[in-house]
């Protein structure tokens, strides 16, 4: 039993962190709904960050707002699938494990809102650049998780390219070395 737990320690830690992130998401949303009225905006950092309380009846950035069942179904399937993949232990690289944990936490955090409230509570508004969307902690988790996957894929592509280049250079050097040996004979 100890070896089995030890073999999945990263996954266990990731799930604990994911649960804490879901809690943080729900606590921050609760603080906003308890202390703000709908539509209220408060400057947190001038020209950088506002807290603006809105209801988002759709998915990310308000898409699918007239078809919540579609997004609820997709989210449930995605979260269950991610949990199965994580539990399988087949995700070898830690960045992917952490990315899955972040996506799970974001999906669960927003799913709790959709199922209990029929909308998602959003409140984080970036004002230092033009970004017309208001979002929440769960959205941040999903975006960061997806960003980690993209970054890891790019890193792996670069490593694979360098590895292939090194193999070609070695093969060329071996051919040159063999040719020189044949000339010497």
Language-model regions, residue ranges each:
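Alpha-helical transmembrane bundles and membrane-interface segments of multipass inner-membrane proteins
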Residues: 1-185
